[in-house]
C-alpha cells in the first residue's frame, strides 16, 4: 500500500532502528509480547521482513515475531513465528442460510504457526448525521454533509436515523457472529478488528460499532458487546435460526475461556423466552471444570416447538453461574400449517 520495503529507502533503516529503541526502553513490559514491522507493506517486502524476523529471533527471545500483518491474497512470510493474515474470516450467509455451526478450522489447519486474523469485521453501517456537530475543530465531516444532502435531495432526509439504526443492528449481528465463529475455531490464535470505531483516515469507512470519537451510536452498548467478546464467552452451534412448530430446536453449547485460570465446578444454565419475558424452557446444561482455551463442550439444549402456536421471536440465553459470562441468540418459530382465510379471489391485469 504505502512504504516500499527492501529498496534501500530510509524506511528500511527506520523500521530497524525504532524497534531497537523501543525494545531497549520497554522490552520487559508485560504488554510487549509480540512484534511486527508494520501493516501491508509493498516493494521487495517478503525478503526484507524475513530478515527482520530472523534478526529479532536471534537478538531477543523474550517475544514472538512476525513480519507484517497482511491481506488474504498476500504472500506467506516463511520465517514468521506467527501469522497475522486475512482469509480465515467473514460469514458465508450471502450464499447460505444463517447458522452458527461453522468455523474457520479448514482455512488455518494447513498452517504450522499460530494464525491471527487480520482486519476482522469491516461491516458497515449508514452514516450517523448527528455526529456532524461533534466536529468542533479544524476537521469537518464534509463527507457526512454530502451524504445528508443527497438524502434530502431524494426526500428521505427524515429517515436518516432509521437507516442508521437498522443498518447498525445488522452490523452488530454480523460482528457478533463473526467473532463467535472465530472463537469456535480450535487453535485460532486470535483476531484483530480493523477498528472498533469508524475509521476516518482513508475516505469513508463506517466499520465501527462506535463513532469516530469512540462514542456509542445507540444500537449496541458495552454490556451487549461483552456478551460475545470477553475473556469467557458461551457459544452455541445452531444449524439455523428459523423453524416451524413441528420441529425441535437443538443447540450444542460450548465455551471459549481465556481467563486467568480454569473455572472449577462451573454450572451452565439456559433459558428460552419470548420478547415479553415469558419463559418457555429453562434448565441446566451441565456442571464441569472449564479449562483455559476454546472448543470446550458444555452440553446441549433441546426444545420441542409444538407449544408455539403463533409466529414469534424467541431468545435462548446461556449463562455460567458465578461469573460474568452470558450470551444469547434469537430464533424465530412459525406454524407448520397455516389456515388461509376463505373468500372471493379477484384477478386483474
Summary of predicted features, one role per range:
Residues 1-210:
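Substrate-binding/catalytic cleft of secreted carbohydrate-active enzymes
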Residues 138-349:
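Carbohydrate-binding surfaces of carbohydrate-active enzymes
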